[in-house]
């Protein structure tokens, strides 16, 4: 057991695999309790997992004894990592471009996700802590034409439609306009 404990930290790729497995297990455990990781936790996990994958593969390639093969494979891997990074980083930034705010409505704390691409929607989920939120949408506000953050903006935007959901995600009511 002591030998395994001393060996695991020396293999970064194995550590990264363990991290991914832990995240997946925690994701499913949270889902059982109707919870989800907050967006920043997912973003941090993806960043650490990507860095661990890159460093772990380079660490394994450095163990190759033939220098020519070692450096050729490292160059190929770095070129692939850069190419894939150039392709996936904009997609990742686009996927995480939605703003996230902590707000209080009717004395209840919510995590508000602003989706402002083509149409602006604000999706409210129950705030459960700095790492997790409820995974059932509680309120959805529709603001019309996209491209802005109605919560983080200094301007006040009128709500076109507000939809309220129950604990199971079923629609309770839909209110048109900026009515109470």
Predicted segments, located by residue:
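Membrane-embedded alpha-helical segments of integral membrane proteins
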Residues: 11-62
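Short, flexible coil/linker elements and helix-boundary hinge sites characteristic
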Residues: 10, 31-34, 63-67, 79, ...
């Amino acid at each position: 057991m002591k030998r395994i404990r001393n060996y695991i930290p020396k293999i970064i790729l194995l550590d990264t695999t363990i991290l991914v497995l832990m995240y997946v297990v925690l994701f499913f455990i949270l889902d059982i309790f109707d919870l989800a990781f907050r967006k920043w936790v997912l973003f941090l996990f993806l960043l650490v997992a990507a860095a661990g994958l890159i460093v772990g593969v380079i660490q394994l390639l450095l163990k190759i004894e033939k220098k020519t093969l070692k450096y050729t494979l490292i160059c190929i891997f770095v070129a692939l990592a850069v190419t894939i990074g150039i392709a996936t980083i904009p997609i990742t930034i686009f996927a995480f471009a939605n703003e996230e705010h902590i707000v209080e409505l009717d004395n209840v704390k919510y995590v508000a996700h602003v989706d402002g691409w083509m149409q602006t929607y604000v999706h409210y989920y129950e705030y459960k802590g700095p790492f997790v939120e409820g995974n059932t949408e509680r309120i959805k506000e529709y603001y019309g034409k996209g491209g802005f953050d109605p919560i983080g903006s200094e301007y006040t935007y009128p709500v076109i439609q507000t939809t309220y959901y129950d604990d199971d995600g079923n629609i309770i009511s839909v209110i048109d306009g900026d009515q109470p």
